[in-house]
Amino acid sequence: MAIPNDSLIYKANKEYSEGLYNDAIENYLKVIDNGYESSELYYNIGNSYFKINDMASAILYFEKAKNISPNDEDIIFNLNVANSKIADKIETVPELFYVRWWNTFYNLFSVDTWAKITIFIFILTLIFASIFFLSSIKNLKKLCFWFGIILLLMSIFTFGLSSQKYYYSKKYNEAIVFTPTLTIKSSPNKNSVDLFVIHEGVKVLIIDKVDNWYEIRIANGSIGWMPCSAVKRI
């Protein structure tokens, strides 16, 4: 008989507070196996892995938590701490100021939240449209018309954001390196030229896949190929 998620989470939280981090991880992962996920759950798993000094796994689950709650300060702080513990300190490619502003706005919410915002704004648009068509008051009709237009444009904009984030999440997948030392190759072949070396815990962006090889890009813009088995996808 399956144990309810609430009981598993309660048990895992208790084990964590008692310093039984491996047991806590086991029970948290059972909750995920049951089909449940939340930023808090992933955050707790990340903290548990951090306590046993498994930084790659900690970063993986902090990143999963961040994908759901991108503005959570605790998640961001712990993720930064975990990243400071790994071997590689990769400098990110500088962004133009308007690109940085756009990315900040774009990443304010998860894809689900942007979708909910779109639905809410569209419902408001329909309400103003209904008042416009049903009202006989000239000034009210004019007000509802312009508000309706503005809200319609906003709903199109937020729908575009939601769709773009969803498309990005499907086409481009981020992953964490789980191999202690990994040599990145120039092509999807173990006999190809060595390009550079990265280590466990580094986040990579998967941009292509050929057989059992991923083409990846790291934060400084460097691109190369690695075996699929070397990473776990976020």
How should each PLM-predicted stretch be described?
Residues 55, 142-179, 186-189, 193, ...:
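Boundary regions of SH3-family modules and the immediately adjacent low-complexity/disordered segments
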Residues 93-133:
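Membrane-embedded alpha-helical segments of integral membrane proteins
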